[in-house]
C-alpha cells in the first residue's frame, strides 16, 4: 500500500523539480545576457 503513494509523490515532484531547474537556468541566462550587454 506504500508503493503507490511513493510513486505518486515521485511523479508529482519530478515536474516541479524540472520546472524549478528550468526557471533557475532561464534566470541565470537572462542575468548573463544583461551582464554581457
From Swiss-Prot:
Classify the source by domain of life: Eukaryota
One Pfam family of this chain: PetG
Compartments where located: Plastid, Chloroplast thylakoid membrane
Per the record, membrane topology reads: Single-pass membrane protein
> Which GO terms label this protein's molecular function in UniProt?
electron transporter, transferring electrons within cytochrome b6/f complex of photosystem II activity
Give the InterPro entries listed for this entry.
Cyt_6/f_cplx_su5 (IPR003683), Cyt_6/f_cplx_su5_sf (IPR036099)
Bilayer-crossing regions: 5-25
Q: Name one GO cellular component term.
A: cytochrome b6f complex
Q: Name one GO biological process term.
A: photosynthesis
Q: Which UniProt keywords apply?
A: Chloroplast, Electron transport, Membrane, Photosynthesis, Plastid, Thylakoid, Transmembrane, Transmembrane helix, Transport
NCBIfam families, per the entry:
PRK00665.1
Under the heading HAMAP family, the entry gives: Cytb6_f_PetG
Family per similarity comment: Belongs to the PetG family.
Tell me how this protein assembles: The 4 large subunits of the cytochrome b6-f complex are cytochrome b6, subunit IV (17 kDa polypeptide, PetD), cytochrome f and the Rieske protein, while the 4 small subunits are PetG, PetL, PetM and PetN. The complex functions as a dimer.
* Record's function text: Component of the cytochrome b6-f complex, which mediates electron transfer between photosystem II (PSII) and photosystem I (PSI), cyclic electron flow around PSI, and state transitions. PetG is required for either the stability or assembly of the cytochrome b6-f complex.
In its UniProt entry, what is this protein called? Answer: Cytochrome b6-f complex subunit 5
| Organism in which the protein naturally occurs | Zygnema circumcarinatum (Green alga)
